[in-house]
């Protein structure tokens, strides 16, 4: 539950910052939770 909550916050930040929209997904994909 906590991980999904963090991802939701991350998605909100991604919407605000387009650059993170490319970096965040790569980090999340590289780090398999």
From Swiss-Prot:
Keywords: Capsid protein, Host nucleus, Host-virus interaction, Late protein, T=25 icosahedral capsid protein, Viral attachment to host cell, Viral penetration into host cytoplasm, Virion, Virus endocytosis by host, Virus entry into host cell. All late proteins expressed from the major late promoter are produced by alternative splicing and alternative polyadenylation of the same gene giving rise to non-overlapping ORFs. A leader sequence is present in the N-terminus of all these mRNAs and is recognized by the viral shutoff protein to provide expression although conventional translation via ribosome scanning from the cap has been shut off in the host cell. It is found in: Virion; Host nucleus. The keyword Transcription does not apply. The keyword ATP-binding does not apply. It comes from Canine adenovirus serotype 1 (strain Utrecht). Belongs to the adenoviridae penton family. Induction: Expressed in the late phase of the viral replicative cycle. Signal peptide: none annotated. Interacts with the fiber protein (via N-terminal tail region). Interacts with the capsid vertex protein; this interaction binds the penton base to neighboring peripentonal hexons. One of its GO terms (biological process) is virion attachment to host cell. This is Penton protein. Major capsid protein that self-associates to form penton base pentamers, each in the shape of a pentagon, situated at the 12 vertices of the pseudo T=25 capsid. Involved in virus secondary attachment to host cell after initial attachment by the fiber protein, and in endocytosis of virions. As the virus enters the host cell, penton proteins are shed concomitant with virion acidification in the endosome.
């Amino acid at each position: 539950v906590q991980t999904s909550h963090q991802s939701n916050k991350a998605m909100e930040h991604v919407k605000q910052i387009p650059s993170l929209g490319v970096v965040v997904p790569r980090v999340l994909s590289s780090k398999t939770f």
